[in-house]
A protein has these predicted regions:
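Short, glycine-rich nucleotide/cofactor-binding loops
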Residues: 54-56, 78-79, 83-100
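Short loop/turn segments at strand-loop or loop-helix junctions that form parts
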Residues: 81-86, 183-187, 228-229
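Histidine-anchored nucleotide/phosphate-binding helix
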Residues: 94-113
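Short internal beta-strands
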Residues: 115-123
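Short, Lys/Arg-enriched N-terminal segments with co-localized hydrophobic residues
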Residues: 7-17
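An acidic, phosphate/nucleotide-engaging active-site surface
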Residues: 130-214
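A short helix->loop->beta-strand "cap" motif at the edges of active sites that frequently abuts
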Residues: 113-114, 219-224
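Positively charged, low-complexity intrinsically disordered leader regions
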Residues: 16-78
Length: 229
């Protein structure tokens, strides 16, 4: 069955017709995007960022990302998950992104038989070891072991030292080039290399410089998905 595009809201790509399956897929994507853009505290940033992302993808962003991952990931493939934002004033990592990352890792194992590898600040390593066990994954800092054994999760502490970050990023990419890289609330520096929190304070010294790895992997053509709030 085909449906005229004129009767479908938001057909950015200008299709003349849409099949029933395509319409259902689009509706699922629209609903997921609508949930993600809920802003009960009136923060405002989510909708601004969403507008730019939607203009880039030309379709619901959640479904766009899901389809990209489905095309990229196969059984046994490594997937890097960059996560861990260290907060002031207590200088400890926030946990909402970390919980999301560990559940995402479990989903990648169940859906694809993938080998998720968490890349985080040293502050978060112990939490991921414990949370990994909670969701039924065996956690290893030795990546060779994580890649070899089933139902496993690798964890890598990424440096906070800007000078050391490029070498570690290259070493990781050379050792294990992932099928995809996903960032879940991982902090990134601005054009001047300064890292800020949500209220504009300089947190450069607190944050893992995993954005250097992100850029290294993008330069190598690795499919990438970024998630934030």
């Amino acid at each position: 069955m085909t449906i005229p595009a004129a009767k479908v809201c938001g057909a950015e790509k200008g299709e003349n017709t849409m099949t029933r399956d395509e319409l259902e897929k689009r509706n699922v994507g629209e609903n997921l995007d609508a949930i993600m853009c809920l802003d009960p505290r009136g923060y405002g940033v989510c909708r601004i960022l969403y507008a730019g992302s939607r203009a880039y993808t030309g379709e619901p962003t959640a479904m766009h990302a899901a389809e990209a991952l489905c095309k990229a990931i196969h059984p046994g493939d490594p997937v890097y998950i960059l996560v861990g934002f260290v907060l002031l004033p207590h200088k400890v990592p926030e946990m909402d992104g970390s919980v999301s990352a560990i559940l995402l890792a479990r989903s990648l194992v169940l859906a694809f038989g993938a080998k998720p590898i968490i890349v985080c600040p040293q502050d978060s390593v112990e939490a991921f070891k414990k949370c990994g066990n909670v969701v039924g994954l065996h956690v290893y800092e030795d990546l060779d072991t994580a890649m070899e054994l089933p139902l496993s999760l690798g964890v890598v502490a990424f440096t906070k030292d800007k000078a050391k970050a490029p070498a570690q990023a290259k070493a990781l990419a050379d050792k294990i080039l992932p099928a995809a890289v996903i960032s879940v609330e991982a902090c990134g520096g601005n054009a001047k290399g300064v890292y800020h929190n949500a209220v504009g304070k300089d947190v450069t010294a607190l944050e893992a410089k995993s954005d250097v790895l992100w850029n290294e992997l993008r330069a190598r053509g690795v499919p990438n998905v970024a998630i934030g709030d």
